[in-house]
Amino acid sequence: MFESHVFARSAAHSAVLYWDKPAAAKAGAQYTVYLDGQPAATCDRTHLTLTDLRNQADYRADVFFAGRCVGSCEFRTTPVKHRIDVTEAPFWAKGDGKTKNTAALQRAIDACGAGDAVYLPAGTYLTGALRLHSNMELYLDEGAVLQGTAEIVDYQPRIPSRFEGVEMRCYSSLLNLGTLDHTAGPNCENVVIRGKGVIASGGRELADKIIADEREHLKDYLAEHAALVAECENERTIPGRVRPRLINMSNCRNVWVHGLTLKNGASWNQHMIYSDNIITDHCRFISEGVWNGDGWDPDSSTNCTLFACEFSTGDDAVAIKSGKNPEGNQINRPSAHIYIFDCRSTAGHGICLGSEMSGGIEDVQIWDCDLTNSWSGIEIKGTPKRGGYVRGVTVRDCTAPRLMVHAVPYNNDGEPAPSQPVFSHMSFERLTLTGRGLRDGGFENVEPIEMAGFDAPGHELRDVTLDAVTVENETGTLTLPLQFCRGLTIRDLTCTARK
């Protein structure tokens, strides 16, 4: 029985291999990958890109660590796909950055079959919302920019969606996959979005327009519910919930996003709701300056994998969610089997689980991530109203400003769940916590570790292990703030004075 699962996503002449980190592997561990029995490469990360492969060919990959095979997989490269060039007949899209190409691009997408790929050559293609379908590929060549407008009308109609844990009608996203239905399985599957280009939307300008428009639309409601508004993070929270995402996936399965820059959604950049087997790798997420501008958000979704990505975001790089009280408890679809590795933050809040976690979050594994340049680092959070659970979390070989497991007071509006959340069964191994968070371009001292459960009996934070954790601060001494904890194990906790 192999120790690690090995997976492959392939194109016609290349494939990306990725695998679980073996339990004995530490930071910088070396792996040797064999292809059809011959050594292909040695690497110090749990993924490898293979090139110059034959199309429609079968391969076997074996991954060796410490002299033994820890996992293997077989994969087949795809046929060479027929290009549907959007700039050619009968579509005639113009990459001049001025012409609105929504209709032309949608026609190309609608014409794309399983053996085709919608192809965008270099250029800037201005567009409104687009709707993808099953069994298709969208490819952006180097220099290609799919640029969403900053005009509200281009993101009509509103569609069933979910935002901050509550189902509602939101503006269409730039790329829309699937139709939301929490009672059903996938209705959009086998989609590839890849290349070397950029997918960007209207960012802060579009967000501000939508918030202002929605605030006017809701002015009587907001005035009548001043207490509800006061419970929110700020006055933009309620009118901002209808903003589009950059890429929205509802009830999707088997989607691969690879190699792109994903930039300036009006809210979150990649949002997966009630979806399964979503793979995102070798992408850059950019949304600095966009309020609430998360990067990659699996929401009541399973088997989602993120690796080799860089984040410069206006909020969380990653936010794992599963609904908000009480609706999230009733729908009861957890986020589970989420794997995040070899990712780096240059700005933003870091990797977060919650706070919308009423449907549950479990089996989250994070390794080999550098979140030094973030504000929150690694954060697991909920509010007392949420209900639900977070359990089965493992974080290994990461650097971050801090580690927080705690309750938060914001985004706490709405009817409470019948009981408080339960946070349990977590392991944090070989972490470096710098005690310095990046905010607004500068570093500030922060508490490196915060551990707190909830005050109701049976809802304490429990069964948590800290092992080989190094903490840096000004003094070289550490007082751990612990509250409502049970079964906390600490091994090899070191505190050093910052030089």
What are these regions (language model features)?
Residues 1-499:
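Extracellular/periplasmic carbohydrate-active domains that bind, remodel
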